[in-house]
Amino acid sequence: MSKKIAVILSGCGVYDGAEIHESVITLLRLDQRGAQVQCFAPNIAQLHVINHLTGEEMPESRNVLVESARIARGNIKDIRDADVDDFDALIVPGGFGSAKNLSNFAIEGAGCTVQPDVLALTEAFAEAGKPVGLMCISPALAAKIYGPGVNCTIGNDAETAAAMNKMGATHTDCAVTEIVEDRARKLVSTPAYMLAQSISEAASGINKMVDRVLELTHEDDA
């Protein structure tokens, strides 16, 4: 029986939303493995809009749900409509949107908070003991979701790892091709573009993470 996976997107574009390569690799791997997928995003304004050609901020406003719909080809719902009981697992691609829209980690660091609708859903998965996959900068939110002692990775960036540890997480350095698993919490993380120098490098770890998340959903079948 195919598993149902929720995917949270944070906009469209690495500098102000979801990392597009990471999101597409995730959706492709889930489809290749026969999973049913539903994308969600918060219906809120982005922190800001970045010109991805120049890296400069643009004087306009964009909506996270509307922008995320670009990646999901329109098949996306407001995160407030998500019910943990409808899904077997959750995956959150990275990109600065995770640190700017799903949370304010990019601004506040260790003193960050998670957007309330995002926190409600991710905490529901944690409390239900359902598998969760986080990649790139998204694991920076793990301590806010799971509490102290959660084991995860963003690769090997010392400053980010220090902020995560300050929040109560236990950061484990990890190669781009590998994953870190907190077995007690069924949380799987991988560095993706925190380390990847190419789309294929990013895919190596993301595919491994997706595969492991799906394996964990089948453990509940036993």
Where are these regions (language model features)?
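Glycine/small-residue-rich loop that forms an oxyanion/phosphate-binding "nest" at active or ligand-binding sites
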Residues: 59-75, 80-85
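Active-site-adjacent pocket-lining segments in enzyme domains
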Residues: 6-20, 24-38, 75-222
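A short, charged/proline- and glycine-enriched loop
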Residues: 1-3
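N-terminal beta-loop-helix "entrance" segment that forms/cooperates
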Residues: 40-65
